[in-house]
Regions:
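Amphipathic alpha-helical coiled-coil segments
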Residues: 38, 42-61, 79, 115, ...
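Small/polar (Gly/Ser/Thr/Ala-rich) solvent-exposed segments
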Residues: 1, 8-41, 162, 181-207, ...
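Outer-membrane beta-barrel domain signature
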Residues: 73, 100-106, 110, 192, ...
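Hydrophobic core residues within well-ordered beta-strands of beta-rich domains
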Residues: 3, 49, 205-207, 253
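Short, conserved glycine- and acidic-residue-centered signature motifs
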Residues: 17, 87, 157, 221-224, ...
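Acidic, glycine-rich loop-and-beta core segments that form the ion-binding/anion-interacting portion
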Residues: 140-193
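Periplasmic alpha-helical coiled-coil/stalk elements that build and connect Gram-negative outer-membrane
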Residues: 41-155, 253-256, 260, 302
């Protein structure tokens, strides 16, 4: 009767175990970064739907103001036609403009309903159960210059840049693991043996040290190492390229923000000028020194 139990423990595997554990940790960090990136994308989409609703509601409010103005103009022109001061052509021009405004109002109202439905669907609510209560008071927030940070300094706060760095870390670890697969491995072992021959029992302990040299893998292994080294270089080059693209993207976004702020400044100034122009054109029309086309043009600019 012969029996026994043996066990072995790897002492050196070319770093495969160590680098494998590090690779697992890096993959966990990648998962967290992707999760954060997804959250940011969801927030951005919700904000886009939100401000789309706000914009359309402001358009409706503007069109309502225009409709009230046209209603007053129509009333005045109708009275002028009845008094024989002007002809019906002016009245028809006002009526056509009223129809155009009503058509625009219907289109914007439909677009608002669609945008509200999209917002509700995205956040998991029925469209008729949500509304956006934001009123634009015509004032500007603080200048965006107060929030400016250079794109280079902002890279560290972006998930995209961190993901690029993790991809480089993964390629380095995989390269080291590939090298480790072609290095000798050392393992220690021990066991307990028992034999009973010719009615003589003979139990004993054994110990061993095993060194394995992957001779048959040297050729294919060297090819794998070269291939993995190229992947490391590719990941580093990709990170450098994507870094520049991220900087350009952030700079373009900043330019869009500053341009939009300047456009709003110009628009606020233009509102006052257009309001005064409309008032003057009304006076000129009533005095008979301008045409209905001039008055309607001033009204459309307002």
């Amino acid at each position: 009767l012969i029996g026994g139990v043996t066990a072995s423990l790897p002492v050196f595997t070319g770093g495969q175990i160590v680098y494998g554990n590090k690779l697992a940790k890096v993959n966990e960090e990648v998962s967290r970064l992707k999760h954060r990136q997804s959250e940011n994308e969801v927030r951005l989409t919700v904000e886009q739907y939100f401000w789309q609703v706000v914009m359309l509601k402001e358009k409706l409010r503007t069109l309502s103001t225009v409709q009230e103005q046209l209603k007053e103009i129509h009333k005045d022109v109708d009275a002028a036609v009845a008094a024989g001061v002007t002809d019906r052509n002016d009245l028809l021009q006002v009526q056509l403009r009223k129809n155009e405004t009503q058509s625009s109002y219907i289109s914007v109202e439909n677009a608002l309903n669609v945008s509200r439905n999209l917002l509700g669907q995205y956040i998991g609510h029925m469209a008729d159960s949500i509304d956006v209560a934001v009123t634009m008071d015509g004032s500007l927030p603080n200048r965006p210059d107060e929030l400016y940070q250079s794109p280079e300094a902002s890279l560290a706060s972006t998930s995209e840049y961190h993901l690029l760095g993790k991809q480089v870390d993964v390629s380095h670890l995989k390269y080291k693991m590939t090298v480790g697969k072609n290095l000798p491995t050392v393992a220690i072992g021990g066991g307990y043996m028992y034999d009973n021959l010719m009615d003589h029992s003979h139990p004993f302990w054994i110990g061993s040290v095993t060194v394995s040299v992957p001779l048959t893998k040297w050729w294919s292994g060297s090819h794998d190492i070269k291939q993995q080294r190229l992947k490391v270089r590719n990941s580093e080059n990709q990170m450098a390229d994507q870094r520049q693209l991220l900087i350009i993207k952030m700079q373009n976004t900043w330019n869009a923000v500053t341009d939009a702020y300047k456009q709003v400044e110009i628009a606020i100034e233009s509102i006052g000028q257009a309001s005064e122009n409309l008032r003057l054109q009304k006076d000129y029309y009533q005095a008979g020194t301008c045409t209905m086309s001039d008055l309607l043009e001033a009204q459309s600019l307002y």
